[in-house]
Amino acid sequence: MRRQPAASRDLFAQEPVPPGSGDGALQDALLSLGSVIDVAGLQQAVKEALSAVLPKVETVYTYLLDGESRLVCEEPPHELPQEGKVREAVISRKRLGCNGLGPSDLPGKPLARLVAPLAPDTQVLVIPLVDKEAGAVAAVILVHCGQLSDNEEWSLQAVEKHTLVALKRVQALQQRESSVAPEATQNPPEEAAGDQKGGVAYTNQDRKILQLCGELYDLDASSLQLKVLQYLQQETQASRCCLLLVSEDNLQLSCKVIGDKVLEEEISFPLTTGRLGQVVEDKKSIQLKDLTSEDMQQLQSMLGCEVQAMLCVPVISRATDQVVALACAFNKLGGDLFTDQDEHVIQHCFHYTSTVLTSTLAFQKEQKLKCECQALLQVAKNLFTHLDDVSVLLQEIITEARNLSNAEICSVFLLDQNELVAKVFDGGVVEDESYEIRIPADQGIAGHVATTGQILNIPDAYAHPLFYRGVDDSTGFRTRNILCFPIKNENQEVIGVAELVNKINGPWFSKFDEDLATAFSIYCGISIAHSLLYKKVNEAQYRSHLANEMMMYHMKVSDDEYTKLLHDGIQPVAAIDSNFASFTYTPRSLPEDDTSMAILSMLQDMNFINNYKIDCPTLARFCLMVKKGYRDPPYHNWMHAFSVSHFCYLLYKNLELTNYLEDMEIFALFISCMCHDLDHRGTNNSFQVASKSVLAALYSSEGSVMERHHFAQAIAILNTHGCNIFDHFSRKDYQRMLDLMRDIILATDLAHHLRIFKDLQKMAEVGYDRTNKQHHSLLLCLLMTSCDLSDQTKGWKTTRKIAELIYKEFFSQGDLEKAMGNRPMEMMDREKAYIPELQISFMEHIAMPIYKLLQDLFPKAAELYERVASNREHWTKVSHKFTIRGLPSNNSLDFLDEEYEVPDLDGARAPINGCCSLDAE
């Protein structure tokens, strides 16, 4: 067995222990493999290495290819079995463990001790060593040993890799011996220092390469590069050398080691331009004179010194025949230029070391992937601890994505119907919806990724047609490169998009970053889906809590109640009041006990009961249940709901709505009017959010907190036994009715009205088109709002007296806000509110524009607008009077006493039972 000189072995013993090896056993094993130069030495080294790193090793057989392409073991001489588990491992080219080999698999006595079954704590490992360059199994090792731990598994992988490298080295030396021996015998060169034991002479360069190869046992690519570069510097007399590694996509060069120094951060630069890129394509060496100025600038920046001479030689993989690195030597000592001999030295070096280099780099890449997988598992742990809050989860996703990819900025968009919405940024979570970023789901880079579901890696953002640089121009930020990837749920549907901007330690995001982003996106999708599911579960609990709260507050409708209501049948509308269908009628004049019958009368007069075959007892129970569903705040009570419903009836009777809307739409509008303020607590949306109420927890993320609660309560009543008036509807009609009710009730939020006001104006200008579905939706919203504010269309006495009720409600909320330590709005503060000015402002900016639109669409509604304008004049006179005399006292409601009443300009005298519709939700 031939080994390297003792001096070399002493050098090896000083090398640091590879990370993860635990002790010197693995290092000694790799040293043994790194120093062999013949077959006998290889077999002995393999046996010693496996015995050192594996438990309870009893037998090791190493099978190598002979001249007839058979796998043969020399000690004792026998051929590898061709059947059973051995054949299975060779065909699959993967290591296989078993509890012994079958008797029919074993050719004679040498392998008899491996026959199954073995002792329970032992096994036979069949280890095929695959030469990827040749595409075939180069050797097979049979080992009888104990069961492996994780550390022993790791050590075995290292031994396998270095055994294959040692085998290739031995084979290369054998080929060289066969070609060099005759020539060396006849004409021994002067520099040859022959080892005549085998009849072969080696040059000094051969011996140096052999010594270098023996030293290349490192599992760390940087340590390996240091040894190779030191050898090149010595042999070429270069002041420093480096190895520029080519990325898998041939678009990027990276350097980690320069001369005798390992850089703290890897340096990367693009390979798309300049002569260095040509070297990768042409596989031909170049010198300094061939470089472009851009190449020179990049190299000098990397080296930190002036380049006076350079030799760049491509390193070609024998497995793929592709350039995997560029070996560069700089500034030859003595100021000379590099020669052809220097180029030959570099090529000769990598002829023997390129396989070790590429395999070590591949091994290190696997280790890096292992570390990244561990990092991803930690990321998953971090993400799954924030499932209770989607916003916090998205913030965590942004942080982890930025850290994993070394990106400067990260943004996450969630897909919301046809829009991509971002409300979580690097700086934190945006609470105000007005500051959210919303972009169409089919526009821009994020939109493209959301639409295609494919990752998009953009090296140069400004050169990409989908990039909009207006934001950069306005902010001064410079977007260099972008990596945008989709986030999908378990059904592979895109639910969001993540966008990474500006790679920090590289020219752009690499293929490795793409793979990492793809893996990361899986965790994102799972965590977001589970977070949304968690949110739904919480919402279900909140709904359950609210339902229980409502059932405790309200009593169910008894059979006696609806039987009494229907005892004499449904009363005709004309029997209620001769002016019941007139805009001048004040519904609050009707006693509250008679309002349920009035609802039934209006439904019958509009023919909905007959058209939709509604069961009268069910309808009676529904009406009584809705009435009980209202609490008793000063304004948002059942009488308000009845007044709103009555105004809907007036619109139907006076404006001929059947020429504009479908019957189902009108029916949905009327029922929505009845239910639009169910379970109102006398406080608005802002108060719910500020007080962190159960309602806010349930609905604040969607907006319109109270309106969504009103609709939910309406559904709860419909789902109550004996109250579903839509029970006979088809599935399609039932779904449409609920959709209409939801949209109409949500339209009672004045914020919604203000959002669609321009669309309403445009519709009034161009004229209503019954064939236009959007016009139907807009008109329903306008009609609902006009019904909700209908108290403003009644006489001055009604409007004046009603203001007392609504401001009592407002001031009660203001008192609660003060008790919470908050500052209420002026209109809610009994000590600051100047009611005449507040009413004038409300009528000018909200009420009058609404009824003006109604007049434009329905000329018969002109009297409504005129009456609202008249009431506005009354408030102006009241305001002027108090400007002269001052407020009567500190109580802002005192001015409503009869002493300060202004005579009714239109002479209308209406019974007082209600309030103005300043709905501040």
Curated annotation (Swiss-Prot):
Active site: H636 (proton donor)
Domain GAF: 220-357, 389-528
Activity regulation note: The 3',5'-cyclic-AMP phosphodiesterase activity is stimulated by 3',5'-cyclic GMP.
Polar residues: bias regions: 177-188
Record's catalysed reaction(s): a nucleoside 3',5'-cyclic phosphate + H2O = a nucleoside 5'-phosphate + H(+); 3',5'-cyclic GMP + H2O = GMP + H(+); 3',5'-cyclic AMP + H2O = AMP + H(+)
Alphabetized UniProt keyword annotations: Acetylation, cAMP, Cell membrane, cGMP, cGMP-binding, Cytoplasm, Hydrolase, Magnesium, Membrane, Metal-binding, Mitochondrion, Mitochondrion inner membrane, Mitochondrion outer membrane, Nucleotide-binding, Repeat, Zinc
Binding site for 3',5'-cyclic GMP: S411, D426, I445, Y468, T479
Region spans: Disordered: 1-21, 177-198
GO biological process, alphabetically ordered: cAMP-mediated signaling; cellular response to cGMP; cellular response to granulocyte macrophage colony-stimulating factor stimulus; cellular response to macrophage colony-stimulating factor stimulus; cellular response to mechanical stimulus; cGMP catabolic process; cGMP-mediated signaling; establishment of endothelial barrier
Cofactor note: Binds 2 divalent metal cations per subunit. Site 1 may preferentially bind zinc ions. Binds 2 divalent metal cations per subunit. Site 2 has a preference for magnesium ions.
Cofactor(s), by name: Zn(2+); Mg(2+)
Protein function: cGMP-activated cyclic nucleotide phosphodiesterase with a dual-specificity for the second messengers cAMP and cGMP, which are key regulators of many important physiological processes. Has a higher efficiency with cGMP compared to cAMP. Plays a role in cell growth and migration.
Protein name (record): cGMP-dependent 3',5'-cyclic phosphodiesterase
Organism of origin: Bos taurus
Taxonomic placement: Eukaryota, Metazoa, Chordata, Craniata, Vertebrata
Designated gene of the protein: PDE2A
